[in-house]
Amino acid sequence: MSETYTIERDLNELEAMVNNLDTYVRGETLYGNAGGSGFFSGNKMPSLTVGAVLMRLRRLDMLRDQMDSKQQQRFGASVDKHAHIAGEWRVHYTGKMNREAHSRLDAMRTFFEECSSDPKLCANVYRPEMLRRTIVQEIRMAMDEINLEVEDEFKQKLSGTDSQ
């Protein structure tokens, strides 16, 4: 993530993700595609996940006052579409949230286990783990916002990760 952040790119990614969210939440794939895939497409879109959408929604909401009116309209449309899909497919949507949170925490556990044998390497490749943890936090906050019961196993994994 050495590229410079832009609201426009973040908004484009959000729109692509939300436009594919309906099909994604009903499917089996955990790390989906936001469109434009293929070897020759030059697609640099991040994976489509509920957590990735939630992170962009929150980040762009915090930056709303820096958007021009067209960007604000596009953002509002994405917020509305996301809310509609999350409500219409609630069971599928929350199922994906849970699966993603566990998957990301499991990946982090593996990372920390590998770090114990090579701390120098760990310091050099920590950035993806920060993103994983950020997305897990977005999922956790969304669970609270929709009053979704949080499993004890998830709480334990989260606590274990944070104690590393």
Please provide the spans of the model-predicted regions.
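Non-transmembrane, amphipathic alpha-helical segments
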Residues: E3-R9, E13, S41-M45, M67, ...
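Amphipathic, non-membrane alpha-helical rod segments
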Residues: G32-S78, L121-E153
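Repeat-associated, polar segments at repeat-unit boundaries in modular proteins
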Residues: L63-A101, F154-D162
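Charged, low-complexity surface segments at secondary-structure and domain boundaries
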Residues: M1-Y5, F39, G87-T94, Q137-E145
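Generic structural signal for well-ordered, non-transmembrane alpha-helical segments
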Residues: N12-E15, N19, G51-L54, R58, ...
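Generic secondary-structure transition motif, activating predominantly at the C-termini of alpha-helices
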Residues: D22-V25, T29, D61, A83, ...
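Long, mid-chain structured domain cores
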Residues: H84-Y126
